[in-house]
Amino acid sequence: MHATETTDFVSVRIITDDVARLVDFYEKATGTPATWATEDFAELRTPTATLAIAGTRTVPLFAPGSARPADNHSVIIEFRVDDVDRLHNALTDWVPDFVSGPTTMPWGNRSLLLRDPDGNLVNFFTPAARPQVN
């Protein structure tokens, strides 16, 4: 069985104990300014998706205990960039937790893995050049 309504995937929300710190990190890392709704909620909007960052005080609005900050070990937050090597050079002075430097993956993407201040895994990648199919 599946839903009959059309759906659009539009955002990922990170729950954090320190919204300002995490927003500052993602603004610096992506060059995308945040739009603040309240002190507990901000969004970094790109043309293709939105990264929402919310404080722990928002969790009870959904269901108490339904989300916990800094407790993610299964999701990778991914950003496509023009030049992952150039980005790595720009981030090196202030990002303390690189998981791996720029690496070409078996599927061809060039990826840079790091952890944000809450420990979430973040992948900045440059897509592989795709051969044109005739």
Locate the predicted segments by residue.
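Vicinal oxygen chelate
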Residues: 1-10, 32-78, 86-115, 126-134
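Conserved beta-strand-loop-alpha-helix junction that forms the acyl-donor binding cleft
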Residues: 13-18, 106
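Short, conserved charged micro-motifs
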Residues: 21, 84-87
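Conserved active-site tyrosine of GNAT-family acetyltransferases
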Residues: 22-27, 91, 119
